[in-house]
Amino acid sequence: MVLKEPPAERIQQLRRLLQRASYAYYALDQPIMEDEVYDQLYRELQELEAAYPEYITPDSPTQRIGEAPVSQFESVSHRIPLYSLENAFTFADMVAWQERWQRYWRTLRQEEPLPPAEYVCELKMDGVALALTYENGLLVRGATRGDGQRGEDVTSNVRTIRPIPLRLALDNPPPVVEVRGEAFLPLERFHQLNQERQAQGEPPFANPRNAAAGTLRQLDPRIVAQRQLDFFAYALHLPEGGSVPLGENQAGEPQSQRQVLYALQHLGFRVNPHHADCPDLEAVKAYYDRWQTARHQLPYLTDGIVVKLNDLKLQQTLGFTQKFPRGSIAWKYEPEQAITDVLAITVQVGRTGALTPVAELAPVQLAGTTVSRATLHNADYIAELDLHIGDKVVIHKAGEIIPEIVRVFPELRPPTARPFTMPTACPECHQPVVRPANEAVSRCGNPRCPAIVRGQIRHWASRDALDIQGLGEKLVQQLVTKELVRTPADLYRLTAAQLLSLERMGQKSADKLLVAIANSKQQPWPRVLYGLGIRHVGSVNAQLLADRFKSVEELATATVADLCGVDGIGEEIAQAVQEWFQDPDHQSLIADLQALGLQLAAALHPAQKALTTEKSLNGKRFVITGTLPTLTREQAKALIQKHGGHVSESVSRQTDYLVVGEKAGSKLRRAQELGIPCINETELIQMCR
């Protein structure tokens, strides 16, 4: 590449061009550059930075995706609490809210006249709240809401979201800028993702919000980048003061929500364009009524509107309740309802053996999706509804997510309708069903029931447990049906040959899954405990127990009294834990997991595991060539070193193995000439076990 100017200058010029183009495209929605031109300049910048790495900076457009996957997210404190909003559901709720803040204001400022009730209304995005921190104009942190005081540090994932600027579009930014906004998945991309997942045998996402939340908790930023999240900013704080654009020829600290939105856009953020100034609650109602209907024309989901007092000083004076800011509120849309027919009632068997009846419905459109099923919980729920197969019913989405039946029309019941009775034999394994005393749920008592095993494996692989990416529902079905997997421990004995015998499983997918399974061994003790699937032990209780009992041996030998001594653990949970560990099958599973190297003690957190793992590659010398299917070169190098091996840059007679990926070069020819064994990624991973 021949340069007309010094490389440092050209690199800076390219960055400015690309950042200006991104600002125009995302913040202003006014593209100034063709995609082909952008791509060409981006590639030139990549090449220059590769040639002159000393000029790479964190805010370069090329550095959005560059961090290696993490083992877990750190908890971080919000400098300014990120509160959720109080919900209103009717206009009467809105009137009551206005009366409350006005009444509270009078208790604070009895001598002063009541300030005007001027509002700014914005669409409430159905996504995931993020808190972004910029220092001297550079993005230094992105965190989830969490409990409002503390969230998870997802900076590496946030950097991949293109509408979020890595550097603020301001020459002299304030020392610290805090931005709040919503990450979401546009509907078109949501449907594309689900098509891709179903083609790969993975379960589809239930809705765009779940997809966005799951994406932000991915440990690998490359996956986040592929999913193409979007972002709208809505709040701005300057904790150390400073000046931002507030209008034409105007700058300073924002005094109104209107100025906040203006400033955000001129700092480089996308702001939802459908906001409005509303001088009173009647105008707010008109805005709400409009979007209650018009929301279905938008390319993303919105589940209500957010109403904020425009005056920021007034908001600040009103402060917060224990849970919510007093100066803003979310007015949720009315849940959509639809009438349909119950075609059948089927029964699902869960991982604990619980039998759950499900209404199979004539498909109907509801809240932007096609609904064909609704949960019926248990036999008592069906009896309370007086529901028959063949009935005409009203369904709605609880929280606009979970479809449920809210009304039955017995007066429209056809002569062919028939009542439903819970089966006395499990629909999966045909063993007897029992209904324990004082429980509304019937259960299959066969621990080897295929449905129970499938549920246990799915739970083990779930996000909050061992988080095994790629182990979808259809794949679990095949593994259990072919009896390749009977317990979670069997996952760690799977071979590439076994996986390749399954439908729709190629070498690349098999390699990727084996890596994900191997990586899950590094998950800490609380996640493993949750993954065991003990009744009543969710992720929160698993953390409580793991904090008190530092190993599986301590927990397995704890008495009910010991367990009840943990704050938050009652007798019912304690009994369930004790009974689980007394089961011989479960004792065998624990022994298996220990032998396989799972983290069943706090002392064997990933940071310590490297010190205790048997060094299976001790003294061996490796060279890596080409692109590996799932591991980056740095990850492969770290894996080899972790197990006692050494990595060299060039092949010599001292090389023990060459790890070969796609587009291998001269190193492969040299290794073949010297007779050095060549292995692929899967074989490397198996050597590390």
From Swiss-Prot:
SMART domains: BRCT, HhH1, LIGANc. GO terms for cellular component: cytosol. It catalyses: NAD(+) + (deoxyribonucleotide)n-3'-hydroxyl + 5'-phospho-(deoxyribonucleotide)m = (deoxyribonucleotide)n+m + AMP + beta-nicotinamide D-nucleotide. It comes from the Bacteria. One of its GO terms (molecular function) is DNA ligase (NAD+) activity. GO terms for biological process: DNA repair; DNA replication. Zn(2+) binds at residues 426, 429, 444, 449. It is an enzyme of class 6 (ligase). InterPro entries: BRCT_dom (IPR001357), BRCT_dom_sf (IPR036420), DisA/LigA_HHH (IPR041663), DNA_ligase (IPR001679), DNA_ligase_AS (IPR018239), DNA_ligase_CS (IPR033136), DNAligase_adenylation (IPR013839), DNAligase_N (IPR013840). Keywords: DNA damage, DNA repair, DNA replication, Ligase, Magnesium, Manganese, Metal-binding, NAD, Zinc. NAD(+) binds at residues 35-39, 84-85, 122, 145, 182, 308, 332. Residues 612-689 form the BRCT domain. The active site is at 124 (n6-amp-lysine intermediate). Its cofactor is Mg(2+); Mn(2+). Its EC number is 6.5.1.2. PANTHER family: CHROMOSOME TRANSMISSION FIDELITY FACTOR 18, DNA LIGASE. Belongs to the NAD-dependent DNA ligase family. LigA subfamily. DNA ligase that catalyzes the formation of phosphodiester linkages between 5'-phosphoryl and 3'-hydroxyl groups in double-stranded DNA using NAD as a coenzyme and as the energy source for the reaction. It is essential for DNA replication and repair of damaged DNA. This is DNA ligase.
